[in-house]
Every structure is written in C-alpha cells, then in structure tokens.
From Swiss-Prot:
Keywords: ATP-binding, Cytoplasm, Ligase, Nucleotide-binding, Purine biosynthesis. This is Phosphoribosylformylglycinamidine cyclo-ligase. It is found in: Cytoplasm. Belongs to the AIR synthase family. NCBIfam families: purM. HAMAP family: AIRS (MF_00741). It catalyses: 2-formamido-N(1)-(5-O-phospho-beta-D-ribosyl)acetamidine + ATP = 5-amino-1-(5-phospho-beta-D-ribosyl)imidazole + ADP + phosphate + H(+). GO terms for biological process: 'de novo' IMP biosynthetic process; adenine biosynthetic process. Disulfide bonds: none annotated. InterPro entries: PurM-like_C_dom, PurM-like_C_sf, PurM-like_N, PurM-like_N_sf, PurM_cligase. It comes from Limosilactobacillus fermentum (strain NBRC 3956 / LMG 18251) (Lactobacillus fermentum). Its EC number is 6.3.3.1.
Length: 345
C-alpha cells in the first residue's frame, strides 16, 4: 500500500472502475460522438447534425436525497437514470434534442462494483434519451464523505434550431394542456418523503402496504424518473407543440407557469388523470394537506404540453402509439386581473 492509499484514495480502484464501465459507455454512442474513455475532454462533432442555425441548450442537475433511499436499499443501478432524466427533460422543455451527457460522482470510498452500477444507470438513461455519455468524473474524497456515501450530478447539452426554440411567449390562450404520466415521485420532494417514512414513522422499505398494490415501499419511492425524449421530441420537430413544462421541484404550481407568459392562466382539472398510489400512501401516512402535495410532488404528471385544439387528437394519438399515457388536464386562458397564473380545481 502506498502513501496515497494510506490517505484513503485508491487509484487502482479507479482503473478497475474504468474497465467495468467501458462497454456501458460505448453503448451510448450516437452520430457526432468522438473518441472514448481516457481523453482529457469529451468530444462531439456538431458537423454531424443537420441543423442550419443551432442553439445549444445545457442543463445541470442532481438527484438530491433520493440517493439516501438507494443507499438504504443498497440498490444503485437505477439512480443514474434519475440524474439523466432530470437534465434531459429540462432541455427538452426548451425544444432541444439531447446530444451528450457528463456525470460526476463524489464518494468517500471508490467501490468499483457500486460505482459501476451507478454508471450503468447513467448509461441506460443516456440510451433512453439518445444522448452519448462522453465523459465524467469519479472523485474519491475520504474526508468529505463517509465510506458508503456518494453524491451524483450530471450535465447535458442539447441542440435545437433557433427558430424552433420553445420560449414562454409562444403558448397562446385557448391551448389545451396535455399531461404525460409520471412513473412516481421522480427526483423531487425526497426530504419530505424521508421525513414521513423514517422520522415521523419507522417504515420498513420492504413492507408492502395495501395502498401500493403489491409494490414494496422501497420499489415505489425508488422508481426511476421517466425520460420523455423519445415520445415528445418527434412532436416538437413536427411543430405540433407550442410549450413544454417539466414538472420537478415545486410541482405543477411552480413549474407549469414557467411555460407561458404572465398574461395567461393555466386552469387545471385535477380529476382529469388518475392518482398514483405512492402519493395516496404518502398523503395518508404523513397527514399531508392538498397544498402540501401540490407544492411538493408532481402528483402523477411528469410533463405537460401546450397544444392548439385542432392538433390535440393527433398529438394524443401519436403519444399513445409511443406507449405514453396522456391526459387532457386543462387549458390556457387569458389571465384575469389579480389572479394567479395557475388554478387547480
């Protein structure tokens, strides 16, 4: 053992990790991706793209304290999907096609098997999004983190034709709001989730409450964030959608109004889509108010599209053909003076 290892950093574990992840990283390659693991920087050739006036759209995000659920379950192979989803769904909301992704893992101890599981999830997320995993960093920091702790973040870059960029001035009064089903909690609100499960109660993550329909609590809360790129991007390229909202921290109340201008109001019918069991379970167990839920969780909708009425049937049909559950959840109207930008009924 050398002095660096004595200090808590094992470079050989890093070399072992690179060997383990090489094939997963390679599986994400797409046109434009150059090189492979080992270069000083990730490379992407924009000349491969058929874009006349490209605008690059970048996003960075993490997974938050959902990582502590993964740690408690010792299940690390899906949390990477979450970090990709949080980033790619954000750039999709601007109209952009994800091109490439970079991940960052910080840990107290580089366990190659665990780190490889995390990267396998990142690679799976990249495949779902059509983005190349062109680089990343695993930082072993023994005095910053405990041995079994890690943090995970990522950055995506996407591209959109300048004329196709989605901005808040595009949605118009009369547009119909179509909600796309979430897969569960996604990656926001986990400080409240953990408060309910572990502090207010001592819930066993292996328990199967009746409200969860056969799922364990752990399975329900760790379900990976849905990636909407493949069903939604073709609709954007065909100019069938005039606004997209990614429903993340703050739920519909915070995120839906970001999609449109201050002169409009979103009127949302909360009975228009089915409630997910995980939210019913958390609401009852935690004694949460309706306001608590709407201000914290996605409540079953991970993305909302603004579509003109004459295009709604076509968009719904194409989403259904892509296997995407879609609900007509409301509309945009001219905002009455003094009222909020969103009303949920």
């Amino acid at each position: 053992m050398n002095r660096y290892q004595e200090a808590g950093v094992d470079v050989n574990a890093g070399y072992e990790l690179v060997k383990r992840i090489k094939e997963n990283v390679k599986s994400t390659n797409r046109p434009g991706a150059l090189g492979g693991i080992g270069a000083f920087g990730g490379l992407f050739d924009l000349g491969e793209l058929k874009v006349k006036h490209p605008v690059l759209v970048s996003g960075t995000d993490g997974v938050g304290t959902k990582l502590l659920i993964a740690k408690a379950m010792d299940q690390h192979d899906t949390i990477g999907i979450d970090v990709v989803a949080m980033c790619v769904n954000d750039v999709l909301a601007q109209g952009a096609e994800p091109l490439y992704f970079l991940d960052y893992i910080a840990t107290g101890h580089n366990d190659p098997a665990k780190m490889a599981d995390i990267v396998a999830g990142v690679a799976e997320g990249c495949r779902q999004a059509g983005a190349a995993l062109i680089g990343g960093e695993t930082a072993e920091m023994p005095d910053m983190y405990d041995q079994d702790e890690y943090d995970l973040a990522g950055t995506v870059t996407g591209v959109v034709e300048k004329d196709d960029l989605l901005t808040s001035d595009q949605p118009q009064a009369g547009a119909i709001l179509l909600g796309l089903a979430s897969s569960g909690i996604h990656s926001n609100g986990f400080s409240l989730v953990r408060q309910i499960l572990f502090k207010d109660h001592q819930v066993d993550l292996a328990a199967t409450p009746a409200k969860l329909g056969g799922q364990t609590v752990g399975q329900a809360v760790l379900a990976p964030t849905k990636i909407y790129v493949k069903p939604v991007l073709p609709l954007l390229k065909d100019h069938l959608v005039e606004g997209v909202a990614h429903i993340t921290g703050g739920g519909l109340i915070e995120n839906l109004p970001r999609m449109f201008g201050d002169d409009l109001q979103a009127q949302v019918d909360s009975s228009a889509w089915p409630s997910l069991p995980v939210f019913d379970y958390l609401k009852e167990l935690g004694g949460l108010s309706d306001d608590d839920c709407w201000q914290t969780f996605n409540m079953g909708l991970g993305m909302i599209l603004a579509v003109q009425p004459d295009l709604v049937d076509q968009v719904k049909s194409r989403l259904n053909q892509a296997g995407e559950a879609c609900y007509q959840v409301g509309q945009l109207v001219n905002r009455p003076a003094g009222e909020e930008k969103i009303v949920i009924k």
